[in-house]
Amino acid sequence: MPSLNDIRSTFLDYFRRNGHRVVESSPLVPRNDPTLMFTNSGMVQFKNCFTGLEHRDYTRATTAQKCVRAGGKHNDLDNVGYTARHHTFFEMLGNFSFGDYFKSDAIPFAWELLTKDFDIPKEKLLVTVYHTDHEAAEIWKKVAGLPDERIIRIPTNDNFWMMGPTGPCGPCTEIFFDHGPSIWGGPPGSADEDGDRFIEIWNLVFMQNEQHPDGSMTPLPKQSIDTGMGLERIGALLQGKHDNYDTDLMRSLIEASAHATSTDPDGPGKTHHRVIADHLRSTSFLIADGVMPSNEGRGYVLRRIMRRAMRHAHLLGAQDPVMHRLVPALVRQMGAAYPELTRGQALIEETLKLEETRFRQTLERGLRLLEDELGHLPEGSPLPGEAAFKLYDTYGFPLDLTQDALREKGRKVDVEGFEAAMAEQKAKARASWSGSGETKDAAIWFDLAETHGATEFLGYDTEQAEGQVLALVAAGAETASVGVGQTVQIILNQTPFYAESGGQVGDTGELRTDTGRARITDVKKGQGLFLHFAEVVEGEIRQGQGATLVVDHARRSAIRANHSATHLLHEALRRALGDHVAQRGSLNAPDRLRFDFSHSRALSPEELAAVEAEVNGFIRSNGAVETRIMSPDDARALGAQALFGEKYGDEVRVVSMGTLAGSGKGTDGQTYSLELCGGTHVSRLGDIGLCVILGDSASSAGVRRIEALTGEGALTYLNEQMKRLTDVAAALKAAPAELVDRVKALVEERRQLQNEVAQLRREAAMGGGAASEAKEIGGVKFLAQVVQGVPGKDMPGLIDEMKARVGSGAVLLISDTGGKAALAAGVTPDLTDRLSAVTLVKAAAEALGGRGGGGRPDMAQAGAADASQADAAIRAAEAVMGG
């Protein structure tokens, strides 16, 4: 019986033999499509190839694409674990043609692979075609010998695929497997098609038309193929299973869950194990691709999936975090096919453990609240939206987690009420991304890239170069020229200006032509083009002119120093804190650097000092910074660090810094820092000058942020700090070396003086001011006193002294603090069961225009706006006692 890993390899090997390039799966976070939350099909990374906006050095491709469907239009989350074929994570096997072959090849490819390589009996297969696609039907008859009754013509959009409202589209043919009459269900297109007898295993899309905004449709100049076959589904079929969760890969994860929770994988908790197995895959792959749990966007979807799995682990009786303990089982199954899992294992485990530990603190309380709410409702009635929102807002229960919990009880949630409560509190709504269209502005850059090709970057070797102005874009449109005062985006054939990427800001500088001069204020990258944001400061700039390009040297040098220091900082943090440390973001600007990294706690002062010392040690060593070009695989083999979610081509730049015996990195195993990086760097570490860490703070859950200065910025900062130190020493009339002891002495002296002042205030207050004699009200002694200038913090001590004077009774103290009143009341312990200081102080405060007040039955305090009516306040307290 072939494993899922075998099936994946068989698929890719088949198409490799048939002239296809095996292309790595793209990340789950789409690189160039902001409208799509997660990669959810194999064609996503090839979208621009199909539209003609991108050309690659191959026209046939095959992939095993990792996909997530857990939000927006494609949301399988609610059904995961309860059905045989719903998943949040799945692998889509596909073959693609970009203007190369079409139906007459795509259909034979599919038939041969299924019936020969996968050895599926031909009589078990049937197909659907779009009702007007006679060509596909005839090819099926010719290639497969299928009779008419096993070529079902479908008139609905189920067999007509469209990329969006406009763009490439075309009919598709779907291949089905017949499990036989022992399983209920009818063929596709019939009334019983939702049964499980006939299962779709492969969809072949024939992109042959283009849909226009006016609704018309015209043939595409280049016809293309896009196919998709779910690995889990074909795997179940080839392993003789009717349930995807019974395949070898899913079964191994289910058994790992059962082992970790000491439960039966097929017992009453079977559904819980299925949910955990599925969600382990989606959460692990999302983290490996750079998504971290948060309260918005992709991070929130990840958190929803994590917490749903964690609730099911809780239902299995797990008392401690479970998910992170299952990661090794996943890596064993899928790490070879997806090396990013292995590389990110430590981060995945730490993130899962941290999130589950935090959520577990509120999970049980939230579930108790849910049970309490249900206990007050009639049998079968839905949970009010306000209650569901409270679970979300207070206990971190995503709505679908609450729905999942209620599903087991046959209940639902008032979703409209939940949404109304969400809107009322103005909580952040999850982003709802759908579609796959491009913006109008983006189309300009696609067109320019198509016309002129990518910009050549020269800035690794020079800060000045000659180039040609290929295009000028102002106010979102191309223009032939721009004059003084106009802002413009300039496209050149080549440039020494670095475009913002990888955390490094874009260069600034100047562009000069024979007719004008422009100040370059920023450079960004899009579709391979370097977009030079500029303002014309002299004459005019014309399309087609030659130009001299000069980068601001001082600014570039400062940026280089900060970027190189970031690499040293990254390695020093990994060595100090552990291999789980991974870059989560950075900023390399001329005036500072910022480095975000995965770590769950604040660094101690000692850890920060050690990291800073290690970085500066390598700076002082003045070792050479070397850059080599190699394949990503070769770079990783040498131990190079790659950034999560970063797109790498066939060749990468690998930057090495410093020497450390036994590091295991580099060709000699003695390189200190080795990273894949496209940024600019110093030539020797000594060029950084100095690195000063300013501090460590939380950036987001599980992510810390360090900010630092280098070079002249660091020196200026230290000089300023030294001046402050000198100024303080002069003010205290002490040498700088004596400052710590001097400040400690001053703090102690101040503390003693504060205590003395407080004591004097108490003595003055008790010895002066308006004081009444203790009187008896309702059989209880009552003593009231009005004092001047006693702050609220000193009043509890005075109340204790007043209670001591009366022995048994109640006391009230009113202090005039500059027109406003501070009040305190006290009741001796023997009377607190019948009289409360809180009641007394509230009544007195209300007489002075105050509201509230609180404390204990034996001592309470309050404040009020008007201290002039102290007598009225005393009478109000007396009235309470006499009442």
Curated annotation (Swiss-Prot):
Q: Where does Zn(2+) bind?
A: H563, H567, C677, H681
Q: How is the cofactor bound?
A: Binds 1 zinc ion per subunit.
What GO CC terms are in its UniProt record?
A: cytosol
Please spell out the taxonomic lineage of the organism that makes this protein: Bacteria, Pseudomonadati, Pseudomonadota, Alphaproteobacteria, Rhodobacterales
Per the entry's comment, what about the domains? Consists of three domains; the N-terminal catalytic domain, the editing domain and the C-terminal C-Ala domain. The editing domain removes incorrectly charged amino acids, while the C-Ala domain, along with tRNA(Ala), serves as a bridge to cooperatively bring together the editing and aminoacylation centers thus stimulating deacylation of misacylated tRNAs.
According to its UniProt record, which reaction does this protein catalyse? tRNA(Ala) + L-alanine + ATP = L-alanyl-tRNA(Ala) + AMP + diphosphate
- Tell me its cofactors: Zn(2+)
UniProt EC number? 6.1.1.7
One Pfam entry name = tRNA-synt_2c
Q: What subcellular locations does the record give?
A: Cytoplasm
NCBIfam families registered for this protein in UniProt: alaS
Report the protein name in the record.
Alanine--tRNA ligase
The alphabetized UniProt keywords are: Aminoacyl-tRNA synthetase, ATP-binding, Cytoplasm, Ligase, Metal-binding, Nucleotide-binding, Protein biosynthesis, RNA-binding, tRNA-binding, Zinc
The molecular function terms in GO held by this entry are:
alanine-tRNA ligase activity; aminoacyl-tRNA deacylase activity; ATP binding; tRNA binding; zinc ion binding
GO annotation, biological process: alanyl-tRNA aminoacylation; negative regulation of DNA-templated transcription
Protein task: Catalyzes the attachment of alanine to tRNA(Ala) in a two-step reaction: alanine is first activated by ATP to form Ala-AMP and then transferred to the acceptor end of tRNA(Ala). Also edits incorrectly charged Ser-tRNA(Ala) and Gly-tRNA(Ala) via its editing domain.
Record family assignment: Belongs to the class-II aminoacyl-tRNA synthetase family.
Please tell me the species this chain comes from: Cereibacter sphaeroides (strain ATCC 17029 / ATH 2.4.9) (Rhodobacter sphaeroides)
